Amino acid sequence: MRILVVHGPNLNMLGTREPGIYGTLTLDRINESLVALADELGCTISPFQSNSEGALVDAIQAAAGTCDGILINPAAYTHTSVAIRDALAAVALPVVEVHLSNIHRREEFRSHSFVAAVAVGQITGFGADSYLLGLRALFTHIEKGIVTKG
């Protein structure tokens, strides 16, 4: 099983960017933790980060036929990108959306997610553990062969 892990804009700045909100772990450390969990579960991950909406859409589209699911933190694009939402729907893979902070407890504009409508589920507010919980949930969902539509 292969999972695409998509990290949206500004996540390359983790560790130094607003640590009171996003924590002190770097994106590299989060990816290392995801690789370790993937090894434990018996799957592989392909992490991808970009600050560019188009590059994120390209990576999502490339997952069709090569990946079994997508774990995504769309970051700020959560609240603005119909293009990312449509790309996720188009590839028709199971998607789990994750966020480091609880987007529903922050500014009002952050509480709406375009991605949620095409995701199997959303895990938010557990810091870096949101990624690990999301990977475990996505793996289990795929293993059980649950069919979902985005």
UniProtKB/Swiss-Prot annotation:
Catalytic residue positions: Y22, H99
CDD domains: DHQase_II
Keyword Lyase part of the UniProt annotation: yes
Pfam families cross-referenced by the UniProt entry: DHquinase_II
SUPFAM superfamilies listed in its UniProt record: Type II 3-dehydroquinate dehydratase (SSF52304)
Entry's family note: Belongs to the type-II 3-dehydroquinase family.
Protein name: 3-dehydroquinate dehydratase
